[in-house]
Structures are given as structure tokens and as C-alpha cells.
Amino acid sequence: MAIVSSNAGSSAPRREPVLDAQPLPEESSGRPDDGLRPKRLDDYIGQDELKQVLGIAVQAALGRGDALDHVLLYGPPGLGKTTMALVLAEELGVTCRITSAPALERPRDIVGLLVNVQPRDLLFIDEIHRLNRVSEELLYPAMEDRRLDLTVGKGSTARTRSLELPPFTLVGATTKAGSLSSPLRDRFGLIQRLEFYGQEDLEAIVSRTADLLGVSLSAGACRRIAGCCRGTPRIANRLLRRVRDVACVQGRQNQIDEGLVSQALSLHRVDHRGLDAGDRRLLAQLDQHHDGGPVGLETLAAALGEDPTTLESVVEPFLLQQGLLVRTPRGRMLTEAARAHLREQEVA
């Protein structure tokens, strides 16, 4: 689904999505520290249960003088998995080496990563569910026995050579924990899910980011941004940046109120529930052309001109979470709450 802030059918250049929790190019520049990330567990807002579990594990590892057990972090994008890995490295006082599974296509890629690991280092692999089978099999003995098994030579001259590895911690991050193979998943000592953030935590995050960006937000402005970000800090920070852009153009960086936030969100076609034009188009399609459903995914995707996988994995989760859409064996159905929201938007 095209979650974009530009008008449908417009000839203007397509803008970057503001309500997609995937990182934008400006947020994926390769710099692990953009100045907004917390550095210690005490500074990390929200995810209290996760912080408690990992805090105990960190203290125990430091007390033993050993590496932290391997950690798997899973959950929707934009909730702070990479940030938590960096925080763990800071708490442990070790180096964090960051990579992603798509960058480890060949065996030599992951071998090079493992042979250069230092004692107690933290190795972070994002999108770990996308590792290929060969890379996974190289990780098995490395994670369990701190050993790297290499095959040298070919055919009848091939022989296996084992290299001892220093103690290290692998932190894997994924949005699809079910896509990990059981042998890989079972080798993680700590498996933790990150949850969507509540309004109070999001307001604290927006307020903190505003301070770091040097902008002044009223309480109402902070509350409005936090209420439109789909429970996701990455989206909250992105919306704040777009609000800051409008404030900068109008010369109002030091007086951002709720009215200015509403103006900026309206520019990007984001409503008070955090739905954008693409979300409302899907709901309107069901309401106006299919009498609320049920409608099959393929039919709905064809009517909207979208890819079925995009609808299912990117668009629908938030609508389902908000109680605006229902999946049934016969297809997608609109809820009364969705109808009420569409009518409300028509009046507005």
C-alpha cells in the first residue's frame, strides 16, 4: 500500500512515507547514533518488562566477567530493537558491531565477521530471519560452542578446520520471529518481544526528542503527535521532524502549538487516529464498493492497485489493531468503528 502523504493521482513527485515504520533513507545513513537514541537503560523510555529482564542479565554477566547470553529481539518495526542493542553494548562497556542479514549472503561474509570478533563483543544482526541456510549453519557452533567450523579444499582433499572464538554476544532483531528456523531460535538464551508504546511513554519520547532537536512544544502539541504515531517511536520522531519543518518555514520553532501540529499533519494527510490517505482509501473501498465486505485480499488489492503482500503486511496490521478492519475466512470486513471514522472525516 502506498502510505504516502502526496495526493492520489497527483503528478507531483512522490514523497517519502511518514507513517511507515521502516527507516527512511535519511534515517539509514549508516550512522548508528543519530543523536536521538538513548545510551543507557535508565534513559530508555518504555518497555519496562524488557528493561528489567535485560538489566538483570547485564548485571549478572558483568558480575561473572563473561559475555551476555545471546539475545533475540522481535516485534514490529520502529520500536527500538537496534537502539536496545546499542544500549546493551554501552551497559556492558563493549563494542557493538552492526550488520544485517541481507549483507551476509556468502559464507565468507559471516566468517569474516566472526573471526574479527573480540572478547565479549556484541554482534548485532538485523532482519536475522533473512539469513540463508549456509550462514545459519555457520552460526550454530559459533553461538553454542564458540567455535567456527570451516571446510578447506574441495572434493577428496577437503578437510574440516575448527577455529576457537572468544566469548561474544549475538543480538538478533526480527519482525518475523516465526520465520526463524527452530535450531537458530533455540540457541538464543533470551528471547524478548517489544510491544507497541502507550500514550504516556510516547509523549515522553516526543518531549525528549523535541528537547534534543531544540524545538519548543506545548503540552497539546506533544499529545497530538504522540496520538498519531501508531504506537511507534520511529514514526513519532519522524512526525516531529515534519512538524519542525513547517515551524521552521513559518519562523515558529519556539512556539509549536497544537494548531501548528494539526496544520503539519493535515499537509501529510494524517488524521487524528494516525490514519493516512492510503488507509482511508482502503476503508472507503470496502465501504462504498463492497458494502463493508467480506472481500478477498486479491480482489481488494486489485481494486486498489496495490500488491496483496503489501496490504497484508504493511497496511492491515494497524487497521486490525485499531478495530477498524476484521479478517474472516471469507475475506476482509469493515467494522462499525471504521464507518464512523469515515463519516467523521467526511464532516471534517
Curated annotation (Swiss-Prot):
DNA binds at R327, R332. GO terms for biological process: DNA recombination; DNA repair. Mg(2+) binds at T82. Coiled coil: none annotated. Its EC number is 3.6.4.-. GO terms for cellular component: cytoplasm; Holliday junction resolvase complex. It comes from the Bacteria. Residues 1-10 have a biased composition (Polar residues). Pfam families: AAA_lid_4, RuvB_C, RuvB_N. GO terms for molecular function: ATP binding; ATP hydrolysis activity; four-way junction DNA binding; four-way junction helicase activity. The RuvA-RuvB-RuvC complex processes Holliday junction (HJ) DNA during genetic recombination and DNA repair, while the RuvA-RuvB complex plays an important role in the rescue of blocked DNA replication forks via replication fork reversal (RFR). RuvA specifically binds to HJ cruciform DNA, conferring on it an open structure. The RuvB hexamer acts as an ATP-dependent pump, pulling dsDNA into and through the RuvAB complex. RuvB forms 2 homohexamers on either side of HJ DNA bound by 1 or 2 RuvA tetramers; 4 subunits per hexamer contact DNA at a time. Belongs to the RuvB family. This is Holliday junction branch migration complex subunit RuvB. It comes from Parasynechococcus marenigrum (strain WH8102). The gene is ruvB.
